[in-house]
Amino acid sequence: MSPSALEERLEQLESRQAFQEVTIEELNQTVIQHEREISRLREHVRLLTDRVRNQQTSLVAPQSEETPPPHY
């Protein structure tokens, strides 16, 4: 390979590497954003689950508060 061909090849590889570094950093930032969003959504699911559980238990009256069934 001639020196100019080697130099051209080296420049191409350096250009590819620079592009890949930018792409990797962008992907890393995207992953970080997704992790934050997943964490936020998990917390929302936990809060909603707790809210549903509390509503379910509040809908069931204790036996002592139940009205007796009608007698026919």
Swiss-Prot record:
Biased amino acid composition, Polar residues: 54-66
Gene3D superfamilies tied to this protein: 1.20.5.300
Highest taxon of the lineage: Bacteria
Disulphide connectivity of cysteines: none
Pfam families: SlyX
Region Disordered, annotated ranges: 52-72
Family under the similarity heading: Belongs to the SlyX family.
NCBIfam families: PRK02793.1
Protein name per UniProt: Protein SlyX
Organism name: Pectobacterium carotovorum subsp. carotovorum (strain PC1)
Gene this protein is translated from: slyX
